[in-house]
From Swiss-Prot:
Pathway: Pyrimidine metabolism; dTTP biosynthesis. Keywords: Cytoplasm, Methyltransferase, Nucleotide biosynthesis, Transferase. It is an enzyme of class 2 (transferase). The keyword tRNA-binding does not apply. The gene is thyA. This is Thymidylate synthase. Its main location: cytoplasm. The active site is at C149.
Length: 266
């Protein structure tokens, strides 16, 4: 069976047919709008093999989100620096992803734990069409170091299988999206385990899907490479989704091509 390469197919499509656009960082991009890719999580874990993805950073970032944290201190303690460019001198990032996931503020002064609420619906009302978690809190965007790129996601259960669809408003295809795919695939595995479900699909939907002009050489190199089989994910059982540790998450048989470095557009 041929190896599915939806991410690489999108990368090639944007590289070849994308529209030249300016952007906030002043770097310049080529871009397509409204793209979608799908992975069957039962056929392997979608950690890219056409270049090595730093999975340690993926796992720790997701655990950091699930902690409801928004200070880079905890990440730095574990050797992860992917958020440092946007942090204040004290390490703060404002009310970004983790804060919104775990402690969305209400007008009455209360807070909503969206992850716990989503899990409760998966267990008690899996056919609900309201199993959604949003990081896009319009009223708090000015306080965020960076407005959410991956803005909200929805869970869907069919035949005992849990699928997740993410909407990403702004998609740095070369650097950011490989992390996002792996992160939300991992979150889907965790949520499925906690709800007593198998995994279904991870569907990634992108708004502004772009390749930065200073990433074109790296993208071209990546697209020359032959894809390899996806690894398998091994996840320890925990009583709560908030109890997972880095050691609970293991990818097996991951044999990627070497990493490709590229500058981050800040």
């Amino acid at each position: 069976m041929p190896i599915a390469t939806p991410y690489e197919d999108l990368l090639r499509r944007v590289l070849e047919t994308g529209t030249a656009k300016s952007d906030r960082t002043g770097t310049g991009t080529r871009s397509l709008f409204g793209q979608q890719i799908r992975y069957d999580l039962g056929c392997g874990f979608p950690l890219l093999t056409t270049k090595k993805v730093h999975f340690k950073s993926v796992v720790y970032e997701l655990l950091w989100f699930l902690r409801g944290d928004s200070n880079v201190g905890w990440l730095q303690q574990h050797g992860v620096t992917i958020w440092d460019e946007w942090a204040s001198e004290t390490g703060d990032l404002g009310p970004i992803y983790g804060v919104q996931w775990r402690s969305w503020p209400t007008p009455s002064g209360e807070h909503i734990d969206q992850i716990s609420a989503a899990l409760e619906l998966l267990r008690t009302d899996p056919d609900s069409r309201r199993i959604i978690v949003s990081a896009w809190n319009v009223g708090q965007i000015p306080q965020m170091a960076l407005p959410p790129c991956h803005a909200f996601f929805q869970f869907y259960v069919a035949d005992g299988r849990l699928s997740c669809q993410l909407y990403q408003r702004s998609a740095d295809l070369f650097l950011g999206v490989p992390f996002n795919i792996a992160s939300y695939a991992l979150l889907t595995h965790m949520m499925a385990a906690q709800a007593g479900l198998s995994v279904g699909e991870f569907i990634w939907t992108g708004g502004d899907c772009h390749i930065y002009d200073n990433h074109v050489e790296q993208v071209t190199e990546q697209l020359r490479r032959e894809p390899r089989p996806y690894p398998k994910l091994s996840l320890s059982q925990r009583d709560s989704i908030f109890d997972y540790t880095y050691e609970d998450v293991v990818v097996q048989d991951y044999d990627p091509h070497p990493a490709i470095k590229a500058p981050v557009a800040v």
